[in-house]
Curated annotation (Swiss-Prot):
The gene is pdxS. D-ribose 5-phosphate binds at D23, G152, G213, G234, S235. Pathway: Cofactor biosynthesis; pyridoxal 5'-phosphate biosynthesis. GO terms for molecular function: pyridoxal 5'-phosphate synthase (glutamine hydrolysing) activity. SUPFAM superfamilies: Ribulose-phoshate binding barrel. It catalyses: aldehydo-D-ribose 5-phosphate + D-glyceraldehyde 3-phosphate + L-glutamine = pyridoxal 5'-phosphate + L-glutamate + phosphate + 3 H2O + H(+). It is an enzyme of class 4 (lyase). It holds the Pfam family SOR_SNZ. Gene3D superfamilies: Aldolase class I. This is Pyridoxal 5'-phosphate synthase subunit PdxS.
């Protein structure tokens, strides 16, 4: 890829539509994800549930781990950089990862600026809780957006909240007279030209995936019904009783989200799901979704 134009980068992200992206920490997990039908894997040192449990500062994964996963995977490999840490992102780009996630799962490195993603060849994915956050990230060069949800909880409620918030605000924008769009853009803290584009297209100008707390095939199918283009699954697979079977079931659920009889069938005997966390028990300052601006 010689030139990382936004058209080219968003085109690469479009290729993942209708798919499932799975967090993996070892080459063995990467093969399980690939055999289950994942469209890409996210290479990590620790899944979000373990990052949450360990506390402290979470940084970019050791390049050795990322490289080992890249060596065995024949599907695209993503990796996470800290919010604002453009050097971590440059390191990952130099290694040849297919996508970089500027992620709130890791401890932010800059409390004022996100990475300027326009100057990179590699496409970026970023999280959002609302339309304003989504459009600010797109203005910075993000080629793909996902809900933030609340990672590492196995609780889908925040992903649902963020998805509905974005969709509601898109509908609100589309219903506005054009003369009122500049004020809407100002209130959102989003570029006017992107607001006008969303109003014209009736959706975000990039692929929009669900992420944060998805643990079951039913969770994944619900996010597709809400209008997402695909699903990220973090801790929900490899923190469960039968990762290979659950991974296959979630891929099938995303592909066949309208077939409720099939959803019932693939949801049988998946082993123990990951232990979930009720969001209200997480103190406000410890919620990963609050990272970023």
């Amino acid at each position: 890829m010689e030139q990382g134009t936004i058209r080219l980068k968003t085109g690469l992200a479009e290729m993942l539509k209708g798919g499932v992206i799975m967090d993996v920490t070892t080459p063995e997990q990467a093969k399980i994800a690939e055999e289950a039908g994942a469209c890409a894997v996210m290479a990590l040192e620790r899944v979000p549930a373990d990052i949450r449990a360990a506390g402290g500062v979470a940084r970019m994964a050791d390049p050795t781990i990322v490289k080992k996963i890249m060596e065995v995977a024949t599907i695209p490999v993503m990796a996470k950089a800290r919010i604002g840490h453009f050097v971590e992102a440059r390191i990952l780009e130099s290694m040849g990862v297919d996508y970089i996630d500027e992620s709130e799962v890791l401890t932010p490195a800059d409390d004022k600026y996100h990475i300027d993603k326009r100057d990179f060849t590699v496409p970026f994915v970023c999280g959002c809780r609302n339309l304003g956050e989504a459009l600010r990230r797109i203005a910075e060069g993000a080629a793909m957006i996902r809900t933030k949800g609340e990672p590492g909880t196995g609780n889908v409620v925040e992903a649902v909240r963020h998805c509905r918030q974005v969709m509601d605000e898109v509908r609100m924008l589309c219903a506005l007279p054009e003369a009122e769009v500049p004020n809407f853009a100002k209130e959102m803290g989003a570029p006017l030209e992107l607001c006008l584009l969303v109003r014209k297209e009736g959706r975000l100008p990039v692929v929009n995936f669900a992420a944060g707390g998805i643990a079951t095939p039913a969770d994944a199918a619900m996010m597709m019904h809400l209008g997402c283009d695909g699903v990220f699954v973090g801790s929900g697979i490899f923190k469960s009783g039968d990762p290979a079977k659950r991974a296959r079931a979630i891929v099938q659920a995303v592909t066949n989200y309208k077939d409720f009889a099939l959803l019932a069938e693939i949801s049988r005997d998946l082993g123990e799901p990951m232990v979930g966390i009720e969001i209200s028990t997480i103190p406000s300052g410890e919620r990963m979704q609050e990272r970023g601006w």
